[in-house]
Amino acid sequence: MSENRADPQFREDVLAGLRGPRRAIPARWLYDERGSELFDEITRLPEYYPTRTETALLQSCRADLATRVGPQTAVIEFGAGSATKTPLLLGAIDPAAYVPIDISGDYLRSAADIVQQQFPALKVMPIEADFTQAVALPEEVGHLDRLGFFPGSTIGNFVPRSSVDLLRHMRDILGEGAKLLIGFDRIKPTNVLIPAYDDAAGVTAAFNLNLLHRINRELEGDIPVDAFAHDVRWNDMQSRIEMHLRCGRDVRFNVAGEAFAMQTGDSIYTENSHKYDLRGLRLLLRAGGWTPLTDYSDANDWFTLVLAEAAPLYAAP
C-alpha cells in the first residue's frame, strides 16, 4: 500500500513541484526518518561548523541565559530533531517542562526519551506535528512562562517573507510575554560555506538524494535516482546556499500515476539556507514580532544566538 494516503500534503507538494517551470520541493520533506538520521550525521561532520559553533555558544552563555530566562519555564523546541543541544539549555535554566515539536514521530519520541532519562524530574511532552502549521500546546504549560527554542539556523531554510510569517506564527503559539532563543548562520566566505553543504564523505549528498528514494517509496515513483547528483550553489544576491538535485541525463519517470520528463542539466530545487548579518537578523526578528534582547556570537562571527522577547500587540484604533 502506498504511504501517501497518510500524508496527502507530501503528494500535493511533490506533484506541484515537479509540474512547475522551476522544479522545487519544500525542504521539510527531506526529513523523513532516514533523512533525520542523515542530518544528525551531517551535524557531526568536520565541515559542518554550525552545530559545534552553536554548541560552544550555548555552553559559554549558560549563566547569562539562566539570569535572563529564569527557572520553571516551559521550553518549546521547534523542529527538535535529535535534540542534541537541548540538554545544555535545559541544564542551564532549570525549566518545569519541555515540549519538543517535530514532524518525524519516531525520531521525536527517541529524542524525548533520551531527554527524559537525563532530566527525570522534568515534564517532557513531545508533539508530533509540523511546527509551521497550527500547534496546540499541552494544557500543563498554560500557566508557565514560555521560552521558544529554535536552534541550528533552521530559520535560514525559509525565504525572508516566509521567515517573517513563521516568526509571527511562533509568537502566536508561545503567547504574550514569551521569549525566543534562535540561531542564525552568518554570512561568511564561500570556502567555508560550500563544504558545509557538500562534504567529502557524501553524507549531505545522500541526505538530498534520499528525497527521491522517499518519493519512489511513498508515492509509487520510479525516478532513476542514479541519474541525479547533489548540487550546491551560493546565491550571492540572496545571501543563501541553494541545494539542488541535478539531472545528469535525459530521463522519464512517473510519480503517483503522473508522467514527468527532465533533460540533462535540469534540476529540482530542494533547500535554501539563508545567511544573515547582524543588522539583517535583527530586522527579521522585529518584522516577525520579536524584540531582540541580547545576542551571542563566536569569535569568528560565524554564528549568532539571539534571545528575543515577544513584542506587544497593539489593537487597531
Residue spans of the language-model regions?
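Conserved SAM/SAH-binding beta-strand->alpha-helix loop
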Residues: 104-106
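N-terminal auxiliary segments of SAM/dcSAM-dependent transferases
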Residues: 1-29, 36
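Class I SAM-dependent methyltransferase Rossmann-like catalytic core
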Residues: 22-69
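Conserved beta-strand signature within the Rossmann-like core of class I S-adenosyl-L-methionine
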Residues: 173-187
